[in-house]
Amino acid sequence: MTDLKIIMRIARTDLAILFYSPIAWFILNVFSFLTTASFTSLMENIVTDYDLSGGKEVSLSGICFLGSYGFLSSVVSNIYIYIPLLTMGLISRETASGSIKLAYSSPVTSGQIVLGKYLAAIGFGCCLMLVPIASAIYGSLVIPSFDWAPVLVALLGLYLLICAYCAIGLFMSSLTTYQVVAAVGTLIILAILNFVGSIGQEYDFIRELTYWLSINGRTIDMLNGVIRSEDVIYFVVVVTLFLTFTTFKLASDRRTISRFRQAISYLGFFVAAMAIGYFTSRPGMIKVWDTTRTKLNSLTENSQHVLAKLTGPVTITNYVNLLDNKSYRYLPIMKKANETIFEPYCLAKPDLQVKYVYYYDFAPNGVANNPKFQGKTVDEMRDYMTMIYNLNPHLFKSPAEIRQIIDLREEQNTFVRIMETQDGKRTFIRDFEDMDATPSEAEITAAIKKMISTPPTVAFIKGDGEREVSKSGDRDYSNFSIEKYSRAALINQGFDVCEIDISHGDTISSLINIVVLAEMRTPLTEKGENQLEAYLARGGNLFILTDTGRQEVMNPFLSKLGIKMEEYQLAQSSADFSPNLILAKATRESGKLTFGFKDDFPKYDLRVSMPGCVALTCSNNDYGFQYTPILETNAKGVWIEKEQTDLQESPVECNASAGEKEQTYITAYALSRQLKDKEQRIIISGDADCISNTELTLSREGYRSGNFNLIIESFRWLSGGEFPIDIRRPHCTDNKLSIGVKDIGTMKTIFIIIIPATLLLIGVGIWFFRRRN
């Protein structure tokens, strides 16, 4: 008899014993009932939400089955309960009864015994998989264009986890004659493997070893439809390791082996497994396959194209100030968790390295503001913080030492990353003061693109009463332009920003790509006007923002563009807001400019709040421009108020006898024309407050603000689509359901009653047949 036949014979025998065991059927029935109940509860919520909302642009395959809130995640979270009960008697039962000695006396090797019993265990694991597979099949029937590939990967991850648990349980079953002890021992080993990943996280080498050894989170990527080579290798190594342990244990029972030799053998197997795991988990060795239809877990095509142009080694250095309020996120113990931020980039570019530099220095917004540290020196604060975090004080560079490397006082000594190429090009990648905090793909790719190309420079004109970016006043523009810790700020989206005073000596150089002229209060000097006209003549792009009361100053220049500001400001009737607040919407024509105007504004019914706004009209078309209205008012309830000038407090009404008329008014235009080899682009807004510091931070009920969207899409169009980075993905095709709320009862009957009842009847039938024979 060949080895394979012996193994299969042992597997069939043990599998039959399992199926004749009431414990196995109890496990199968409890598992099926709880699993189907979880699935139907999730599906009920999804179906109800779908019926109420009318559908959303989301992957229903993913919502139902993938991710941390999907159905398969709940199965993975609970499967550890069942496997120890399944494997506890595979060897311990025979050891306790003495029947194992018959196997020892037969011409069967220990390896054949172990493999046979292991195949029986994972064979029963296949039976456990039937319920999740049935749920996936049902999902494919009710979700048209079901995304099968990632769901199959998630099912594979679940089965690999079952296989690993079975190998561990089989080993524990070989160590004792008591089945309960074997089950408890298996749970203890699983607990250790879950906990070990948090040990030694402050030490680089130990962190890599313990993180790899940890089984916690090993299926997370697969549950998202991603196959990682290190995860597959992990399961193969763990299964092989514990099967080897079990084989050696049975072999040592058959013949006398000294305890020293046993210890050396176990240690050798363990070290070999750790070595394999360590080297196969190095960034250059890891291969990743994203099986989702939209490649949701991978870099977008735009990011991949940008990264492909980045040649040579690249270093991202994290500068962590112990005395900064954000330091706890980036201490050594958090290194592994923070790797996920740049992991897609490191996998795509193996010579991209992430380093950490730890230091301590005074941070204006740091722990020094705590009353506990009043009057203390930075050294005293360092000593206290290192004591709190249980860190070595010598890990942190002193203020003098860090300033020899880099002076971060302009960054307020807060946490910051610097990306640097081999030839010395560098750029900042910051954290932000919002819910997500860490940079997204858009900000990281923008930083990379700034190093491989010349970023567009946005120059804000000042000196004639214009809004300024260097000031943080209510009417100024620092928030969206140079605010370092604002995600949407131009400097964090790939632009360079500067201010120029063209009326008093500054020039508009050829390096400037976009000029912003925001509400002049006094006319430009002759020199300034000549410069602006020369910039306009050579095809420079402009963003012009006007405001009420500035017609006399700005209309002369706007007339050269074929645009005119109406004499009086707009009013909008509202029960909630003052009449001077105009809530403009994107026009249908604006969709020709950018995808944001086309998709986001109508999809979310975004409104641009424009307090104190004037209507714009095309005065003539003698300059070769194509005029595209991008913002407009409602057709009703909006008019040009000609009688009153103070619209903030006084109630106003549309007076037809005064020439006031309710109709749609244009509040922003986009102008474009072809000049030689380039297209000139200009945006003109009838309000300058709409992108001011105050307006961007105000929150009003009753509408969804699109002011930041206006900024992003305007500069996207003005920069020719170069920045901000487009990280859109293909639309989901599995976003429809073919069942409704009325079908929930049928679904529950099938999954909660019919499937568990069928399994129960089969189990009872086998038990009855077995007992009768």
Predicted regions and their residues:
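Selective transmembrane-helix segments that form parts of the transport pathway or gating/packing helices
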Residues: 22, 83, 109-138, 163
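Hydrophobic alpha-helical transmembrane segments of multi-pass membrane transport/permease proteins
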Residues: 22-48, 74-83, 189-192
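Terminal transmembrane helical anchor/hairpin motif
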Residues: 42-66, 175, 182-255, 630, ...
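Long, hydrophobic alpha-helical segments
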Residues: 69-93, 128
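Hydrophobic alpha-helical transmembrane segments of polytopic membrane proteins
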Residues: 152-178, 241-243
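Extracellular ligand-binding/catalytic regions of CAZymes and related secreted enzymes
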Residues: 256-284, 290-309, 315, 441-457, ...
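Juxtamembrane extramembrane loops of integral membrane proteins
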Residues: 282-424, 428-447, 455, 461-507, ...
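Acidic, S/T/G-rich, low-cysteine, solvent-exposed domains in lumenal/extracellular/periplasmic regions
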Residues: 477-723
